[in-house]
């Protein structure tokens, strides 16, 4: 196997947090210690300061580079049997056999636009097959006209052909992040690295980028099958959750300096660490450099649909995204990024809508989400991959959220920390409540593996006309945990969920206690839906599961802090199914409820447990 040396610029992006991410100044007043109400007002003033930074739009030279001038040809489409959701078969549209590949034409148009000093690469109306990634360059806006539908190839090999790093049999790969761990992997469908002043835009929601995540490949599997756990049909050939014989039999084969105790901790008691989804984080724990974490061909880690790394002044606007193989949008270590009026329509596994990671100064405005996982999930590194620092200074406003695991979610990959996040004027519409409900609306999740800090999170003016899931989805604690099995619905059923014991059985290394504090929620109004038992809004109003000290398996005792300093004010949570026990609390301190109505009863109290 051969691999080129990562150039100094990219090495620095992989190893060191950028100054822009490290800074906290966003042009808004600092928080003043003049009482809780004043502090919250100051926080929202800070949020407005973030929004104000996006008043001046990005500017691109007024010249177009139409992809048809570089040889692109539209294609016809046919309907085939495929997945319309993770476990639901149906008819899906795909390019007809013999369709022309537009990869080279789009790449040539972007290169010409960049060489001219920037402008707009225009994808006109029509259906376009692209057998490879669209790679953005500085000062280039890739724009989809009204009625433009870009179908990215569903053949994984097409995303292991054009990367910068020749990894032999694994393909030509790119620097990527997969579930918050750095690696060399298949290219995302839309990709940029270290660029500035870039945009992906559409005329309206008939401007579509399509990842074809549910369209079968030549061997009968689709991208979504790589997740594993198929409920129906033949077993997939391979998946991220199955032991991969291409991975070493001992982590010491790639990290020979590890002690016996370190090896035992990382590998655990079985060979599950050799599945691709566990092998990559194990490489991080072992300190293996990103340049040696080689995946791509022979592995089963699906690429994100849109991934930008180390970019600044980024605009995503006005298009629809369908059927992503994995996370839909994943900016990493980016600054001053805006996503506006984008429709995210992807019901596959891990189809998070928007996952900003280790980013600074982000605005999410006027977007609509219908996702197979979290609608928004803010990330900040995992295991030892925290070099880019926290995600901070994020405003989410005027959005609509339908199906998904969580609406506005922080975590679970948050080892680098998350702070100064503001969500306001959100409608958790949950339109599909009867068949595909939103599991939980406001969600924070971490565990003893992720660790990190989560603080200064503010939510206000939220409506939920159809509540959230009425059924709890219980989690599996570690054997021997003080949390009894099948007892805590931390994955679904609560309107507000703070889960510090998220999926504890998935991680062998649990040595980083999380810190969750200073959470302020106000103006949440939850509606009821009509059931056979009467009007209901959720299973429970609140679920606050603090860190479970039993889970910690580090060398020495660590300070395990409770969830603390949470205020919930002027909220009406409707009528929970479990109105007799409207909240679950474990290891929490100073949770203050003020004018909080649950099942018609007003609560003014401070809770600890």
Can you say where each PLM-predicted feature lies in the sequence?
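An acidic- and aromatic-residue-enriched active-site/binding cleft used to recognize and process polar
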Residues: 126-128, 139-141, 147, 155, ...
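Asp-box/BNR beta-propeller blade signature and adjacent active/binding-site loops
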Residues: 61, 75, 82-83, 103, ...
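Short glycine/acidic-rich loop motifs that flank beta-strands on beta-rich extracellular proteins
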Residues: 118, 131-132, 153-155, 212-215, ...
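Extracellular "leader-to-stem" segments immediately downstream of a signal peptide or signal-anchor
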Residues: 1-141, 145-310, 317, 326, ...
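Right-handed parallel beta-helix
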Residues: 146-147, 196-207, 312-322, 335-346, ...
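Alpha-helix capping and helix-loop boundary segments enriched in small/acidic/polar residues
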Residues: 96-100, 330, 351, 355, ...
């Amino acid at each position: 196997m051969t691999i080129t040396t990562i150039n100094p610029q990219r090495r620095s992006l992989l190893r060191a947090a950028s100054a822009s991410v490290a800074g906290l100044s966003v042009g808004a007043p600092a928080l003043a210690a003049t009482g809780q109400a004043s502090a919250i007002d100051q926080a929202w003033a800070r949020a407005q300061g973030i929004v104000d930074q996006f008043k001046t739009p990005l500017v691109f030279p007024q010249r177009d580079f139409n992809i048809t001038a570089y040889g692109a040809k539209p294609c016809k489409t046919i309907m085939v049997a495929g997945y319309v959701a993770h476990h639901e078969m149906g008819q899906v549209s795909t390019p007809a056999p013999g369709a022309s590949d537009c990869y080279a034409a789009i790449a040539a148009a972007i290169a010409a636009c960049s060489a001219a000093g920037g402008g707009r690469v225009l994808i006109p109306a029509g259906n376009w097959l692209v057998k490879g990634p669209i790679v953005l360059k500085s000062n280039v806006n890739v724009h989809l006209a009204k009625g433009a539908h870009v179908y990215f190839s569903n053949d994984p090999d097409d995303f292991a052909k054009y990367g910068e790093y020749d990894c032999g049999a694994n393909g030509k790969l790119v620097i990527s992040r997969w579930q918050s761990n750095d690696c060399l992997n298949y290219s995302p469908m839309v990709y940029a690295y270290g660029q500035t002043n870039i945009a992906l835009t559409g005329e309206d929601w008939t401007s579509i980028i399509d990842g074809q995540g549910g369209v079968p490949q030549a061997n009968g599997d689709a991208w979504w099958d790589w997740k594993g756990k198929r409920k129906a049909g033949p077993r997939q050939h391979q998946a991220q959750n199955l032991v991969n014989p291409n991975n070493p039999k001992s982590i010491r084969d790639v990290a020979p300096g590890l002690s016996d105790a370190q090896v035992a901790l990382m590998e655990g008691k079985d060979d599950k660490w050799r599945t691709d989804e566990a092998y990559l984080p194990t490489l991080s724990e072992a300190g293996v450099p990103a340049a040696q974490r080689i995946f791509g061909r022979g592995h089963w880690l699906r690429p994100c649909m849109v991934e930008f790394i180390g970019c600044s002044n980024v605009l995503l606007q006005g298009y629809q995204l369908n059927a992503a193989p994995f996370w839909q949008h994943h900016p990493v270590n980016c600054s001053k990024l805006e996503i506006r009026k984008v429709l995210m329509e992807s019901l596959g596994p891990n189809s998070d809508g928007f996952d900003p990671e280790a980013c600074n100064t982000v605005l999410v405005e006027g977007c609509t989400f219908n996702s197979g996982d979290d609608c928004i999930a803010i990330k900040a590194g995992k295991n030892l991959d925290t070099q880019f620092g926290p995600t901070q200074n994020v405003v989410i406003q005027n959005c609509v959220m339908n199906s998904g695991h969580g609406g506005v979610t922080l975590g679970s990959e948050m080892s680098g920390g998350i702070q100064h996040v503001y969500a306001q004027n959100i409608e958790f519409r949950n339109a599909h409540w009867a068949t595909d409900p939103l599991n939980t609306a406001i969600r924070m999740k971490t565990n003893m593996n992720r660790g990190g800090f989560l603080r200064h999170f503010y939510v206000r003016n939220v409506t939920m006309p159809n509540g959230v899931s009425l059924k709890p989805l219980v989690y599996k604690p570690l054997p021997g945990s003080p949390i009894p099995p099948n007892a805590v619905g931390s994955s679904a059923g609560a309107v507000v969920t703070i889960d510090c014991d998220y999926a504890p059985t998935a991680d062998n290394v649990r040595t980083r206690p999380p810190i969750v504090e200073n959470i302020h929620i106000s103006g949440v109004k939850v509606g009821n839906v009509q059931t056979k038992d009467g009007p209901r809004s959720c299973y429970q109003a609140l679920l606050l599961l603090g860190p479970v000290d039993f889970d910690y398996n580090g060398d020495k005792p660590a300070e395990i802090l409770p969830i603390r300093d949470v205020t919930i004010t002027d909220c009406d949570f409707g009528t929970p199914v479990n109105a007799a026990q409207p909240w679950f609390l474990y290891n929490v301190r100073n949770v203050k409820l003020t004018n909080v109505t649950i099942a018609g009863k007003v609560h003014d109290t401070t809770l600890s447990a």
